Amino acid sequence: MKILLIIISFFFIGNSNAEATVKLPKDVSSGSKFEKSLTGKYYKKYGYQIVNKADGHPVRSGEQSIRFEVRDGDCGQDEDGGWSDCKGDRERHELSGASSAMSKGEYWFSWSLYFPEEHQNLWPLSNNYGQFHQRKSQPVFMFIELRGGYSVIRTIGDVDYDERRLIRNDDMKGKWHDILINAKWSKKDDGFFKVWVNDKLKYDYKGPTKTAKYVYQKIGVYSTGITRYMNYENIDNIEKCFEEKGRTTDENTALYTLYGKKIKHDISVQIYNKCKSFYKSVKIPTRVVYFDEVRKNKKKEKVGVFE
């Protein structure tokens, strides 16, 4: 799992050109500057929108919130072509706080999440709703919807890995969830990362919180493992493919684990490329999430929900 998370994260995040920069109203965000993550032509107008309570959208506090949406096929590349989601087995619409990156010290963060009633857990497609990334390196904390629900995953260094469920599947939809984080960015053992959900402490880690110089926040929808989803939805057709084309020992093992919705990234791509001509057409359901009260500050009282 650790290797998979490193593979699915990319190293060239953040583009500071004027076209990429977005200005979020104080009603929904404070403390960080955000820009579109990947600024190629793929970034759709519906990718992120500032929406209003008056128009029937859910809002945690105030009059506005941020709505993110990813539809089937919403992959693209950055302006210089250095990174491509389409080639990398992923889709996204995210905002990046790379221009407000932090090098050290203690910070407080907050955001509130709302998953609509029609929301679906699409595992083994991995949907990331928020993360802390490093410049030119891997993420350190990711907030991913795993099979059992919304979870925090720690990936610091080559061997460190941990995951903790924050919100159960049966408690996610149709309500706001308030996330509060207290973090100290450090390469040493004096670092820490604490997560409260709806005023309850759910995660309390002490130790190094980074390996690179700078850490920054990202919000939105980031889907990884498109081929895993396609393979799972065509699992019977993989059997037909293997009967005709044969199978390696690794492919046979991967198929067995896929029945349990588990499969490693590289072998998933390999099986997809080998067997896709046997597949039925599959459209990934649209992913929608609302963010509100996205705040960063050195002081706890400056983040969270302000009624």
Task: Specify the residue positions occupied by each region the protein language model found.
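Long, low-complexity, intrinsically disordered N-terminal extensions of eukaryotic proteins, enriched
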Residues: 2-3, 18-20
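Sec-dependent N-terminal signal peptides
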Residues: 3-14
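Low-complexity, Ser/Thr/Pro/Gly-rich disordered linker/stalk regions
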Residues: 19-178, 183-307
